């Protein structure tokens, strides 16, 4: 149960290594419920932040490769922007090529940073589709300046300790972002 002053230091949901960025949202009770679901181990898909020196580390999981990449993107964006009231106003299509799945994860996250830096937009959702010679990524974006900033904005994707693999419970990834 959240108490009156818990919005200042909200309780840490079970299953999360660090408090979810969404806990700083305007409605702490709803944010807490969404955060627990996003980071609850055993759910079919989700994401969470984990402690990592001065950088941002995101873990994500889903039944499919594309779902795992989607969760990694949402985890990244939610680490620095409150998406609770966000809705898509633009669609951006990018064709990306990668030799391996972890290269694709890096390429998608680099595109997220590029969109933010060049046009000031951030994804609120995305869809991936395999095509001849690559992957089409459709980003549903919104103007980042209309959202509340809740953390440091990532500047680059680090290749250090990058993990992306399929196991018997689906796909998992862990990626570090320089902030």
From Swiss-Prot:
InterPro entries, alphabetized: Archease_dom (IPR023572), Archease_dom_sf (IPR036820)
Induction: A member of the dormancy regulon. Induced in response to reduced oxygen tension (hypoxia) and low levels of nitric oxide (NO).
Domain of life: Bacteria
Molecular function per GO: metal ion binding
Gene Ontology terms describing biological process: tRNA processing
Sequence positions that bind Ca(2+): 55, 178-179
Keyword Calcium on entry: yes
UniProt keywords, alphabetically: Calcium, Metal-binding, tRNA processing
Keyword tRNA processing: yes
Similarity section: Belongs to the archease family.
Function: Activates the tRNA-splicing ligase complex by facilitating the enzymatic turnover of catalytic subunit RtcB. Acts by promoting the guanylylation of RtcB, a key intermediate step in tRNA ligation. Can also alter the NTP specificity of RtcB such that ATP, dGTP or ITP is used efficiently.
Name of this protein: Probable protein archease
Organism: Mycobacterium tuberculosis (strain CDC 1551 / Oshkosh)
């Amino acid at each position: 149960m959240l108490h009156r002053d818990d919005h200042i230091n909200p309780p840490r949901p079970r299953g999360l290594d660090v408090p979810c960025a969404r806990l700083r949202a305007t409605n702490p009770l709803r944010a807490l419920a969404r955060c627990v679901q996003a980071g609850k181990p055993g759910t079919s898909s989700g994401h969470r932040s984990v402690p990592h020196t001065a950088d941002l580390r995101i873990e994500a999981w889903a039944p499919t490769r594309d779902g795992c990449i989607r969760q990694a993107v949402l985890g990244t964006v939610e680490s620095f922007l409150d998406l609770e009231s966000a809705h898509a106003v633009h669609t951006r299509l990018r064709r990306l090529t990668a030799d391996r799945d972890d290269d694709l994860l890096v390429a998608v996250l680099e595109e997220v940073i590029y969109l933010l830096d060049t046009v000031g937009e951030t994804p609120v959702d995305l869809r991936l589709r395999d095509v001849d010679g690559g992957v089409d990524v459709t980003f549903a974006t919104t103007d980042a300046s209309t959202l509340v900033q809740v953390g440091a904005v990532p500047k680059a994707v680090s290749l250090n300790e990058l993990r992306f693999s399929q196991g018997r419970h689906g796909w998992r990834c862990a990626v570090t972002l320089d902030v």
